[in-house]
Amino acid sequence: KMKEEGGMHVRFELHEEMTVKSDRLTPGETLRIHLPLPVVGAQVKSAALLSTSHPAAFIAPADEPQRTVYFELPYEPGMTVSAELAYEIEAPYCQPHAREVLAEQPTFDTEEMPPHVVFTPYLRALAKEIVGDETNALLKARKIYDFITTQAVYRFMPPYLTVTNIPEYFLSGLRGDCGVQAITFVTLCRLCGVPAQWQSGLYTKPDSAGHH
């Protein structure tokens, strides 16, 4: 359908809530809660906070890179804090062709970004083994993508904060979650001179929502 229509435009409405367990706070104690808000940019074309269950203490401005609605309330046992929000996505259909790739690629999004996007000797050697003599940037990216997605096993991860170098951690056992595989892809692409950047966020379905 996306190919036929050239893309897709979808409006999402989302309910999010948080309930604090009764043994975590005492009645009257200050409860501080952040609930995430969508950020306009990339494929997200509009976003709005429709309503909240309680008055918000602060709503992050639209230009914040990671937006939340913040509540500061006296705790009552069993209380639930919630928000209703909406956002619109425009996702164009894209089918890249290797023959259209320019030989000269931009230099932005090709640099190291410690501590995880680091061009270690091990990663340099592995990248050379994966891409071989390929010079086309799109085909390099495809080789890296195929290596990661066909050789790896999906596994849940410990907190990223505890991992010194995510790509090397992942490649040492070829096990990791979607974020680990993504940052490894970004690192190997950049190492090969292919511009790549990270994108993450909330995905929603009619019956569930999660981070991806």
Q: Which residue stretches match the model-derived regions?
A:
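Intrinsically disordered, low-complexity N-terminal segments that are enriched in acidic
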Residues: 1-94
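Short intrinsically disordered, low-complexity coil segments enriched in acidic
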Residues: 2-5, 153-154, 212
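Generic recognition of flexible, low-complexity loop/linker segments
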Residues: 19-22, 130-133, 174, 185
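Acidic low-complexity segments
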Residues: 61-172
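Solvent-exposed loop/turn segments at secondary-structure junctions
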Residues: 90, 151-154, 177-178, 203-206
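Active-site nucleophilic cysteine motif
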Residues: 137-144, 174-189
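Hydrophobic/aromatic-rich core segments of domains that either
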Residues: 179-212
